[in-house]
Amino acid sequence: MPTINVNKVDLERLSNISLSDKMIEDRFPMMGVEVEEIFEEVDKSGKKQKMVQFSINPDRPDYLSVEGLARGFRGFMGITTGIQEFEVLPSDIKVTVEENKTRPYVAFALVKNVLMDELVLESMINLQEKLHWAIGRDRKKLAIGIHDFDKVKAPFTYKEIKGDEIKFVPLGYEDEEMTPREIIEKHEKGIKYAHLIQDDRFPIIVDVNGEVLSLPPIINGTLTKVTPTSKNLLIDITGTEKEAVEETLNIIVCALAERRGTIVSVNVNGKKYPDLTLKSRIISIESINKKLGLELNPGEIIQAVKKSGMDALYEDGNLIVKIPAYRNDILHNVDLKEEIAINYGYEKFEGKLPSVATTGSKDPVEKKCNAMSDLMIGLGFYEVMNLTLSNQDTLFEKMNLKVEEKDYIEVLKPASIEHRVLRTSILPLLLETLYINKHHSLPQKIFEIGDCVIIDENDTETDTKCKNIKKIAGAITHPLTNFNEIKSSTEALLREFFEDFEFENYEHPAFIPGRCAKIIKDGKEVGFFGEIHPEVILNFELEHPIVGFEITIE
């Protein structure tokens, strides 16, 4: 989990409460924020300052700054409850967005009259970097720029340029002008994030005079560098996902508003940012009490909702809950139930022994899997573990399989193109593992036991119509491996853990015709084994013969 270091005096000032070390250690964990340590450090002036290090859950990016953390703590302690609404003043500041294929989404906002000092500047920079990781995936999904607005002049333009089209002084090079291409070749940040630039097309933000504010997602210009004397801050967020860009902007402007800043809108191609419109959800009182095992009345639940920084209205057995724009973690009603539990107080829940006595034991399937693992290791195999997420290319195309979309589950918003499908088979991932380890000596014998996910339209137990099935797969590669070797290993496994099995000839696109068999148990196919087809071997950029098997355990 990400951690943040917070100045204790600053936390007290923003929380509007005096905090003892014991109070910090007792109360913050009850609102879901772990206290790692309380320590002292020497600041730039040579004075000792008491600091607190917190661990922040990834689902609460608004807690990644002392401003957001203090806001949440004020509500939790009942100092200020309900929604803290932030006014957005209108302006005539405009941003023109030209076509940008690399990072197509952008949002801007201005926060004026921020009470800035060294402490606030450090907090702002830390929030920026933490959000780069927590939401931005190290700037791949989004990048954040914060500028001294008084150094530039509106309107602004966001566009793409070629690598040698413009020169400016980047942060860290106080007097040396560089082109974007030179930045990714010489600048520390440029080298680190050069992989995010495609086809020599560089996103850039300039003002009306052509002055460069930022070269996202790499570096800002020195011209707009924020200092402790800056008070009017222009924020830009650029990225590949519109929702993430807008939510991140909301988190930052609300944090700066805690420093007495005034939020001012910016017109981006006709749309005004930031959009701090409240979200709403409807949830029943009955479902809340059922989930929490309590009998709370509407008033008690509304009080807990208000302590979480939200508002609620009771109507016909339901609550209409209003959610602030900086809360991007409320995705489902179960999230509201968790917030109610936290702010009602976990310490108020009474522990009860179950009415039925139970004795813990190992899951029979896991027990069987552990025994299988021991046997495979005894046969000279090394165990590997791959992700359940994969992609169509690895699972199907490289295996010469033709599969329709309805036969597998695809992730709606994948983090990367390599991880966008839930695997239906383990063997392709073992071939991928062999490719990664092709520089190691032969023979190589590997296996994996793990879950695959399939679509089951006849499943009546879940809403998803999907279920996990446990499989085991193995692969061997060396110049002399053959059908008999994999048959021997497969039979050893089957004799130990399966009864009354038999083999039948099997035509599988990933295997050499005539050198593949399927495993039949109780009249059903439970697996297969054989020699991998040379075309498949080449698809995975491997060189030596490979044999493999895959068996369904459960």
UniProtKB/Swiss-Prot annotation:
Subunit structure comment from the entry: Tetramer of two alpha and two beta subunits.
A GO MF term: magnesium ion binding
Coiled-coil intervals: none
Keyword Chloroplast: no
Broad class of enzyme this protein falls into: ligase
Name this polypeptide is given: Phenylalanine--tRNA ligase beta subunit
InterPro entries linked to this entry: aa-tRNA-synth_II/BPL/LPL, B3/B4_tRNA-bd, DNA-bd_dom_put_sf, Phe-tRNA-ligase_IIc_bsu, Phe-tRNA-synth_IIc_bsu_arc_euk, Phe-tRNA_synthase-like_B3/B4, Phe_tRNA_ligase_beta2_arc, PheRS_beta_core
Name of the gene encoding the protein in the UniProt record: pheT
Family: Belongs to the phenylalanyl-tRNA synthetase beta subunit family. Type 2 subfamily.
Location relative to the cell: Cytoplasm
Ranges for domain B5: 276-351
Organism: Methanococcus maripaludis (strain C7 / ATCC BAA-1331)
E.C. number: 6.1.1.20
Catalytic activity reported: tRNA(Phe) + L-phenylalanine + ATP = L-phenylalanyl-tRNA(Phe) + AMP + diphosphate + H(+)
UniProt cofactor(s): Mg(2+)
Gene Ontology cellular-component annotations: phenylalanine-tRNA ligase complex
